[in-house]
Amino acid sequence: MLIVGGNTSGTEFSDQGTILTPEIWNPTTRAWRSVADLSVPRNYHSVALLMTDGRVWSGGGGLCNCAADHPDHQVYSPPYLFNADGTLATRPVIAAAPDVVTFGRTVNVQATAGAAKV
């Protein structure tokens, strides 16, 4: 889980108290880890979306026709997408999964090597 954006002041249409540092939840260690700061505040009316390649797109904020408007976006690339030398890491691929799932049922998904516990 990635938490991105927000502020501490609750003041609408303002970048006062902006939280620039995203955090990632590690379910194994049950701890949050801070990652690299955002370059632009993401406050009121902002959005973050998980992209199909594992990166996170975040954009917007403001909508007040003032300095707190941020009609732009940025893309966060989680560290696990890369090897230590900066090259792209091999990503697991879903090899088999059901076409339909039912609420309350267990879903089994087969993936190529490298998939961790989900």
Language model features by range: what are they?
Residues M1-V118:
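Kelch-like beta-propeller repeat domains
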